[in-house]
């Protein structure tokens, strides 16, 4: 099928695999993989896509593919990835695949120079091209820009962000120290904010929005970094294969001995905050030798160093110190940072044990004394005060509204541990804030015209165990995905509709309900969490129960027991919840949600740290203390500062900033879970492409216009360079002249109501027009002026040609007048002399008759001399009369009188001669009369037969018209009956459509949930549960399930029959009911297949027409979307009709204009005809007759794929006036076009299906 062309079909690990269609099922296609001949599998028809003809070809912009679908998108990315081409476009969106190794020269300074000022598409896809586009858009549009770098953890967001910043500073910096500072700030931020996770060795555990500010000359003048949601829980605990923040390990590995002794550092395994995770350093062979043995943990000694081409703890420590120096940190401030980091490590080593006294509480273990001493020393605290603050909590009693006694409440071991960890998180969090503020101080700016912001924030995260950090990160990604949907999909389509471009609508998943679930006031999860924090005794269990109670029937929220992973099903309902995010379902364990949502310390700990002897420590907490003065509660109580709502506020401010700027998108893709090079896991990459919206963008860009400019903006940009005569032009007319002057192809752009739009891949042309360089604008104005001059000169030429044509027309008319005068004069002359001329003609005719006299005389036997004398005298009289007419003016009456006398003489003479031969002539005359009578009799019989046939045809046509009118009346009667119940039916259908739409959304979401669960299971070496595995089987839509249910009540269940089996049964079966059922199922599958072909046709090609549009104009969507129309029960009348009507033969003819000729010939001179012979409800023979083309003959069986697949009722032919013709009219055309020979050859090759036509031909041949 499909002429052996390959298609892409789903594959569980590769995403898609190439194969051939070998059979058509009820709702699926049977595929034979190209690399596994003989093996087949089923694939849902809407998950099969046509493949490119050259499977090894790759394109830089996926919009250039012949077939635009998710399979070709994935394959193109894969082919380019195998060639180390990690960047690909989808229109103006960049897809970046993480290579996990250094590609030579791809980010060199020469490469940077090669992209400067180049339009998107003129150079190979690159992150530099997006950065340059953002800069040029900022410069031309006078509008700040944003670059949103998104993707999963480990997809390469941080690296691509650094490349964008480096490109902007190197290309458009002022050459001063500030350019280097902006670039050098990254190593410092990464050291304090990045860490190794199971999915990424250099994962950013915070979000940042880096703004590069430019002056009016578009030169870099400074920058600013905003940061969001540092993962504070990582400071105290990490996973087994994960590490704490890089700074801890780099300080242990790279610090000098002097610093090491001052900070009392040792190997990572000696610190509680490091030894519960991975304690190995990142190092290569050279730096491994430079790390002293006493700094290596036993795990490092046993397993060796961690390997990553971008990470090296010892070398990165040196680079970090260099970066600190470049951004202006002196040695003292550098040591302050290290001192706080070391203080946090020693704080974590403080252990507690239960006190032996009856008062309860706890004490420090003896072995923790050194750690307490080191921590107090490094943080500038008193040892005793630190001990007391960690083991007790101060409470202040109240009496009658006045302050009472200060009471110290001893803490239990668990409470002390929590207090210690809270202090460590707070200290490190404030240190990180200080680092970011210090970075911002190193590149200040006084004034800024515009900025380019680069957003790098943690990607969508899904682990086996997910907590509050993952919840906030995924909430952020939901908001960013919504911004992407709004900017790229929603706003684009609204603009296309507003401008009247006629672009087809693209549907996408709206995640607003998920965002509302999290952030809506009062009942949102964040507000419920804040409310829980305000309770006297908050608990995670109570919070979780309230969430489930408030959102009991919410589609996006469910209980852990419904997870696809077995490990989550062990959770109780009050221990977690599942949120169905845009990328898939994630199970959150709510333990510590309440604690992590509070960013405040107990008053005793906060007072302790704020009163530190160390001025650097005090400075870290001063700003926080000032901000929270008004929010402090009574001593001893834990004041509440909501982390969730603080992040929500920051996020909304960020999105407001993004919405106020132009946006460019970089979608980073993680090629595999093992983080190895040249390994492409298609299924999980496909999931990333789908979740990032690339498939929807691809659908939109089939007819989209990613670049646009307002007529007035263009006009105003060029106005000051225009001469006065051009300035008078209308803006729209000027734009048209500009495009004509540049020689742009009209296919590449389209004019809207107020803007001009450019197709994907035409960014170079757009940039050429929008380039605001004065010399360039002046040059374009000259070209417009030149084009206008040339255009007007052509108009002058045309006018000259028109004048010449008018002159020739005048000359032609003068000659015509002369000809008319000549003709009139001739006519007047003829009218004057016509009697004499007519007389001469008649007399001349009479003279010619004398030859007949001579013939008669020659046959006479007697009296010849006398007769000859009489004839001679008659001839003399005739000559005399002719001479008289010529010489004298005689009237018509005179001529007639003398002519009559001569005629009488000649008749008398002739009658005398004829009497002698009367007998012979009489016999001859009788014979001729007899022949004439016989001929007349035959002619009358033929006329009678013709009239009889015409009468019969008129009678048949009247019967056909009467039948058509009767059918029309019956149809109208049925419609009237339907209208009476239309309100109920429409309401029911609306409910069904809504339910089915929701069901489709649920199925799509469950599919994403399964894919995400599978990826977690692969990563965590955990199998998906049996129920989840069962769900991975081929899923059927509700309509297909209804079809199967209906099949159980029918006599013949054909749902499992193959396409070939249906065809063979139709050709051989004698069971009328089975034959009717097979015909119906056969044509239903043809409808589904042709609908699939129409949806997946080649780009910029017309849909293949098997019949005129008026016949095939039915809705394709129900067949692709598994709508209830697929239910065979709904088609039962057609089957019953075939059984009841005993295969009535009907013939039709309607006009047929091919799509390619539709607009080329307005007068329909190339109109063809479409003939159809229906054997019962199904078509048996089909003809197409087109001018200048050989006729196309098709017969059922042999040509099913090219014939009309609709039944007679669905075509509407019976309701078309004048469409039905007589069998004789069809058969005449069929025979004349060679149909008999074509049908005979099909019968002999056993390809023709048994029909009325085949039976008649076989009888004729016998």
UniProtKB/Swiss-Prot annotation:
Region spans: Interaction with TOM1: 1125-1253
Record keywords: Actin-binding, ATP-binding, Calmodulin-binding, Cell membrane, Cell projection, Coated pit, Coiled coil, Cytoplasm, Cytoplasmic vesicle, Deafness, Disease variant, Endocytosis, Golgi apparatus, Hearing, Membrane, Motor protein, Myosin, Nucleotide-binding, Nucleus, Phosphoprotein, Protein transport, Transport
Tissue: Within the cochlea, expressed specifically within the sensory hair cells (at protein level). Expressed in the inner and outer plexiform layer of the retina (at protein level). Widely expressed. Expressed in the brain, kidney, liver, and testis.
Binding site for ATP: 151-158
Myosin N-terminal SH3-like domain location: 2-53
Region spans: Three-helix bundle: 835-916
Location of the region described as Required for binding calmodulin in the Swiss-Prot/TrEMBL record: 782-810
Protein's GO biological process: cellular response to electrical stimulus; chemical synaptic transmission; dendrite development; endocytosis; glutamate secretion; inner ear auditory receptor cell differentiation; inner ear development; inner ear morphogenesis
Localization of this protein: Golgi apparatus, trans-Golgi network membrane; Golgi apparatus; Nucleus; Cytoplasm, Perinuclear region
The protein, known as: Unconventional myosin-VI
Gene for this chain: Myo6
């Amino acid at each position: 099928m499909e002429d052996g062309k390959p298609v892409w079909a789903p594959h569980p690990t590769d995403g898609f695999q190439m194969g051939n269609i070998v059979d058509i099922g009820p709702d699926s296609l049977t595929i034979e993989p190209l690399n596994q001949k003989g093996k087949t599998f089923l694939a849902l028809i809407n998950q099969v896509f046509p493949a490119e003809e050259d499977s090894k070809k790759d394109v830089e912009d996926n919009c250039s593919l012949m077939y635009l679908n998710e399979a070709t998108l994935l394959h193109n990315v894969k082919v380019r990835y195998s060639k180390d081409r990690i960047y690909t476009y989808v229109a103006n969106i960049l897809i970046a695949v993480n290579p996990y190794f250094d590609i030579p020269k791809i980010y060199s300074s020469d490469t940077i120079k090669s992209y400067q000022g180049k339009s998107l598409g003129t150079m190979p896809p690159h992150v530099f091209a997006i950065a340059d586009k953002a800069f040029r858009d900022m410069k031309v549009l006078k509008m700040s820009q944003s670059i949103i770098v998104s993707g999963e953890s480990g997809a390469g967001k941080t690296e691509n962000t650094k490349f964008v910043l480096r490109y902007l500073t190197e290309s458009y910096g002022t050459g001063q120290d500030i350019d280097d500072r902006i670039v050098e700030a990254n190593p410092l931020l990464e050291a304090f904010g990045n860490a190794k996770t199971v999915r990424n060795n250099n994962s950013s555990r915070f979000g940042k929005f880096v703004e590069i500010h430019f002056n009016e000359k578009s030169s870099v003048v400074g920058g600013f970094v905003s940061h969001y949601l540092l993962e504070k829980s990582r400071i105290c605990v990490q996973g087994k294969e994960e590490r704490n923040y890089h700074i801890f390990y780099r300080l242990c590995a790279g610090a000098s001995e002097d610093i090491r002794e001052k900070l009392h550092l040792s190997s990572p395994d000696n610190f509680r905050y490091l030894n519960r995770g991975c304690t190995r350093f990142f190092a290569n062979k050279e730096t491994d030798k430079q790390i002293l043995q006493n700094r290596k943990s036993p795990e490092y000694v046993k397993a060796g160093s961690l390997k990553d081409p971008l990470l090296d703890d010892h070398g990165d420590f040196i680079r970090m110190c260099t970066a600190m120096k470049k951004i202006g940190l002196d040695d003292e401030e550098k040591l302050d940072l290290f001192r706080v980091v070391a203080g946090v490590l020693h704080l974590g080593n403080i252990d507690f044990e239960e006190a032996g006294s009856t008062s309860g509480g706890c004490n420090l273990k003896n072995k923790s004394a050194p750690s307490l001493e080191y921590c107090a020393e490094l943080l500038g605290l008193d040892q005793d005060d630190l001990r007391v603050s960690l083991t007790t909590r101060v409470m202040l009693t109240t009496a009658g509204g006045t302050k009472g006694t200060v009471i110290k409440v001893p803490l239990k071991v668990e409470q002390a541990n929590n207090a210690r960890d809270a202090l460590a998180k707070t200290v490190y969090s404030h240190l990180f804030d200080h680092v970011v503020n210090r970075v911002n101080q190193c590149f200040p700016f006084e004034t800024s015209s515009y900025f380019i912001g680069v957003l790098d924030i943690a990607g969508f995260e899904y682990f086996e165990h997910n907590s509050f950090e993952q919840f906030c990160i995924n909430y952020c990604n939901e908001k960013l995905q919504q911004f992407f949907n709004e900017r790229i999909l929603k706003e684009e389509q609204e603009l296309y509709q507003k401008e009247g471009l006629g672009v087809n609508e693209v549907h996408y998943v709206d995640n607003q309900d998920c965002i509302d679930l999290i952030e809506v006031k009062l009942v949102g999860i964040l507000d419920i969490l804040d409310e829980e924090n305000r309770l006297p005794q908050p608990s995670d269990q109570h919070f979780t129960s309230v969430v489930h109670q408030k959102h009991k029937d919410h589609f996006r929220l469910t209980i852990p027991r419904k997870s696809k992973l077995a490990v989550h099903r062990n959770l109780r309902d009050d221990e977690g919840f599942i949120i169905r995010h845009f990328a898939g379902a994630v199970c959150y364990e709510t333990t510590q949600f309440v604690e992590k949502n509070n960013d405040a310390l107990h008053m005793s700990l906060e007072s302790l740290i704020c009163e530190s002897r160390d001025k650097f420590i005090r400075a870290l907490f001063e700003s926080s203390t000032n901000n929270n003065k008004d929010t402090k509660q009574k001593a001893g109580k834990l004041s509440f500062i909501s982390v969730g709502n603080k992040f929500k506020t920051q996020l909304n401010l960020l999105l407001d900033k993004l919405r106020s700027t132009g946006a460019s998108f970089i979608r980073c893709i993680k090629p595999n879970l093992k983080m190895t090079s040249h390994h492409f896991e298609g299924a999980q990459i496909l999931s990333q492409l789908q979740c990032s919206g690339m498939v929807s963008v691809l659908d939109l860009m089939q007819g989209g216009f990613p670049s646009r400019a307002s007529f007035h903006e263009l006009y105003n940009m060029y106005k000051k360079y225009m001469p006065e005569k051009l300035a008078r032009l209308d803006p729209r007319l000027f734009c048209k002249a500009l495009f004509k002057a540049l020689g742009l192809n009209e296919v590449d752009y389209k004019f809207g109501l107020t803007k001009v739009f450019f197709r994907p891949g035409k960014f170079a042309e757009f940039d050429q027009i929008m380039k605001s360089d004065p010399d360039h604008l002046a040059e374009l104005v000259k070209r417009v002026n030149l084009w206008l001059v040339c255009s007007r000169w052509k108009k002058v030429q045309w006018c000259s040609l028109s004048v010449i044509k008018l002159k020739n027309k005048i000359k032609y008319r003068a000659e015509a007048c002369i000809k008319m005068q000549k003709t009139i004069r001739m006519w007047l002359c003829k009218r004057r002399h016509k009697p004499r001329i007519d007389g001469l003609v008649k007399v001349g005719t009479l003279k010619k008759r004398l030859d007949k006299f001579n013939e008669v005389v020659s046959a006479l036997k007697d009296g010849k001399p006398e007769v000859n004398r009489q004839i001679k005298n008659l001839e003399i009289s005739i000559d005399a009369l002719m001479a008289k007419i010529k010489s004298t003016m005689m009237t018509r009456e005179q001529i007639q009188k003398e002519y009559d006398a001569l005629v009488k003489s000649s008749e008398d003479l002739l009658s005398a001669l004829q009497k002698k031969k009367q007998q012979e002539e009489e016999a001859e005359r009788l014979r001729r009369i007899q022949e004439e009578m016989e001929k007349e009799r035959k002619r009358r019989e033929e006329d009678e037969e013709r009239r009889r046939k015409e009468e019969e045809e008129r009678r048949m046509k009247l019967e056909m018209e009467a039948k058509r009118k009767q059918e029309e009346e019956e149809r109208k009667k049925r419609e009237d009956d339907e209208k009476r119940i239309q309100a109920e039916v429409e309401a029911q259908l609306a409910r069904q459509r809504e339910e089915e739409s929701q069901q489709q959304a649920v199925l799509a979401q469950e599919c994403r949930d399964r894919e995400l669960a599978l990826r977690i299971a692969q990563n965590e070496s955990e199998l998906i549960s049996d129920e989840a595995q069962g769900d991975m089987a081929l899923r059927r839509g509700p309509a297909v399930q209804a079809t199967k249910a209906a099949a159980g009540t029918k006599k013949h269940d054909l749902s499992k029959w193959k396409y070939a089996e249906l065809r063979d049964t139709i050709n051989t079966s004698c069971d009328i009911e089975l034959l009717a059922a097979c015909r119906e199922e056969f044509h239903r599958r043809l409808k589904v297949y042709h609908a699939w072909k129409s949806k997946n046709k080649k780009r910029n090609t017309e849909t293949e027409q098997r019949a005129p549009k008026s016949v095939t104009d039915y809705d394709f969507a129900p067949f692709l979307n598994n709508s209830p129309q697929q239910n065979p029960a709904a088609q039962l009348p057609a089957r019953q009709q075939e059984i009841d009507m005993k295969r009535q033969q009907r013939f039709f003819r309607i006009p047929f204009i091919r799509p390619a000729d539709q607009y080329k010939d307005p007068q329909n001179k190339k109109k063809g005809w479409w003939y159809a012979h229906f054997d019962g409800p199904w078509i048996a023979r089909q003809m197409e007759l087109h001018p200048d083309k050989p006729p196309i003959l098709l017969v059922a069986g042999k040509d099913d794929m090219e014939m009309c697949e609709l039944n007679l009722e669905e075509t509407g032919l019976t309701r078309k006036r004048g469409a039905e013709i007589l069998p004789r009219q069809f058969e005449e055309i069929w025979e004349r076009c060679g149909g008999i020979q074509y049908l005979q050859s099909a019968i002999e090759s056993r390809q023709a299906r048994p029909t009325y036509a085949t039976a008649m031909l076989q009888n004729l041949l016998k």
